[in-house]
Amino acid sequence: MKTAVHFGAGNIGRGFIGLLLYQSGYQTIFIDVNNQVIDEINKQKSYHVYLAGKEKQELTVNHITGINSIKEPDAVTEAIVKADVVTTAVGPTILPVIAKAISKGLQERTKQNNSPLNIIACENMVGGSSLLKEHVFESLEAHKIGEFDRLYGFPDAAVDRIVPNQTNKNLLDVMVEPYYEWVVEKKKIVGEVPPIFGITYVDDLAPYIERKLFTVNTGHAIPAYLGTHLGYDTIVEAMKDLRIDDTIYGALAESGEALIHAYGFNREMHQEYVSKIIQRFQNPYISDDVKRVARGPIRKLGAKDRLVKPALMYIEYTGKIPVYLAKTIAAALLFNNDEDREAIELQKKISATGYQQAFVEVSGCDSDSILTKKVIEQLRLLQNKK
């Protein structure tokens, strides 16, 4: 039986990547720092995944073990030495942390097992595997870099599946939406293509990453930030508000124009894709908390992320002003959550310098740019019309 090493035993790791690895015939070793989850994995050796829908289909995942990377670093190294594939679902900020363990494992692997290995970062970001590779290679001696490039692939991936916040009777069980997408860049794979059910291998990943980021993530941000501003608790509740409905269709029309111009997507097919995405947010069987989806506003207001980049692309390709994307950016600037470190930091910036300067600082936009002016205009409208 093939072995997969997966970093991140959270809901996404178990409910999305772990499920597909099992369905592909892998035994999976979950690596995490959460001792309770790792203990339960080793105790139960299986868990259930439920598809959020009327029938709540139940799927069982077997052949799993867990390693606490803090308590058993040598076991992590040994697992990487013997692995057939390595995947991650830890969050973008944790990739530099796990890179040290992966680097150590790969260095030991070159001594014991001279076979190729692919490491696929399944993160909500552009270029996750490439970033992970940079951090893995940081600790290498110069003469080892060529060998690592020859043996180890870091193909970038685009992943998409809504896994809401949840509390289940069994700690390991997880509910996910039925829809998923996992696209991997084929040209960066070393050796044989990993035979994983559900992966679509493509030659050029960029269009798929940006289509997902600027449709799914952009779209999800709208009921999250506007929903919070308007007093809603869940995405499903927020999606019933006509003001939010109007904004999401408008914003995804703007980001869609940018994507069609940039990558030549078929207009009719892209509109069908947008409609499917909006229907996912309206799924009554997934109750996702608006504040969970909205967390990390500084990262999400970044120059290359889901709100600012499609807005700038829209301006560049059409010469028009992205009203609905600007409105969403404004709502993100208003987001306040005492349990979110980035939200606290953002509000401190705003208190110190004002909304305009804070936006300029986190987005990289000029203070007199078209987008900045429109964002501040929309922000004032939101403040006055709540």
UniProtKB/Swiss-Prot annotation:
Key words of the record: NAD, Oxidoreductase
Catalytic activities: D-mannitol 1-phosphate + NAD(+) = beta-D-fructose 6-phosphate + NADH + H(+)
UniProt EC number: 1.1.1.17
Sites where the protein binds NAD(+): 4-15
InterPro entries tied to this protein: 6-PGluconate_DH-like_C_sf, 6PGD_dom2, Mannitol_1_phos_5_DH, Mannitol_DH, Mannitol_DH_C, Mannitol_DH_CS, Mannitol_DH_N, NAD(P)-bd_dom_sf
Pfam families: Mannitol_dh, Mannitol_dh_C
Signal sequence annotation: none
Gene3D superfamilies per UniProt: N-(1-d-carboxylethyl)-l-norvaline Dehydrogenase, domain 2, NAD(P)-binding Rossmann-like Domain
UniProt GO cellular component terms: cytosol
GO-annotated biological processes: mannitol catabolic process
Single annotated GO MF: mannitol-1-phosphate 5-dehydrogenase activity
Matches recorded under PANTHER family: ALTRONATE OXIDOREDUCTASE-RELATED (PTHR30524:SF0), MANNITOL-1-PHOSPHATE 5-DEHYDROGENASE (PTHR30524)
Family the entry assigns: Belongs to the mannitol dehydrogenase family.
HAMAP family documented for this protein: Mannitol_dehydrog
Name this protein carries in UniProt: Mannitol-1-phosphate 5-dehydrogenase
Organism per entry: Oceanobacillus iheyensis (strain DSM 14371 / CIP 107618 / JCM 11309 / KCTC 3954 / HTE831)
